[in-house]
Design a protein with these regions (language model features):
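Conserved beta-strand-loop surface patch within small alpha/beta domains used
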Residues: 1-77, 85-145
């Protein structure tokens, strides 16, 4: 077999893509919004190169984000993201998120009032989800609550 690459530790979201995500989340508030980030792998980092917003198909969109993974979705490596919009919700993965997200990489954006306050990245390991760093282009960590 080949060499197993080092595990991903960081998601990098350049400013133009970050601005696009923020706008998408704010526009759909108080409903949860989401989509995918098409990425390139650079060593231990996933660098977002495209933002693909996807409609929320949940019957209870203020509480849950549900969508269909189809041809709109970029090929791996990719990061699935969605917002948590209720002030009572948490800034990380809920129990439901942990069970229901079928993707290896997830980004939760905590936006209880529409503006994104926190970005938390996660990778699905063998047994559980592990937290990743989330950075802007400059290597500075994005807000994390």
């Amino acid at each position: 077999g080949g060499v197993v690459p080092w595990p991903i530790r960081t998601v990098v979201i350049p400013p133009p893509i970050l601005a696009s995500i923020k706008s998408h989340v704010a526009t759909h508030h108080p409903n949860e919004a989401g989509g995918f980030l098409g990425c390139q792998r650079r060593g231990r980092r996933l660098r977002a190169t495209r933002h693909i917003p996807i409609p929320n198909e949940s019957a209870i969109p203020k509480r849950r984000f549900e969508t269909t993974v189809d041809e709109r979705v970029p090929p791996p490596p990719r990061v699935f993201y969605h917002s948590h919009t209720s002030p009572e919700s948490i800034s990380g993965l809920t129990k439901l998120d942990k069970r229901s997200i079928p993707e290896p990489f997830a980004l939760i954006i905590f936006a209880p009032h529409g503006n994104a306050l926190s970005y938390r990245g996660f990778k699905h390991g063998v047994l559980e989800w592990r937290e990743l760093q989330v950075e802007a282009d400059t290597g500075r960590q994005l807000a994390r609550l």
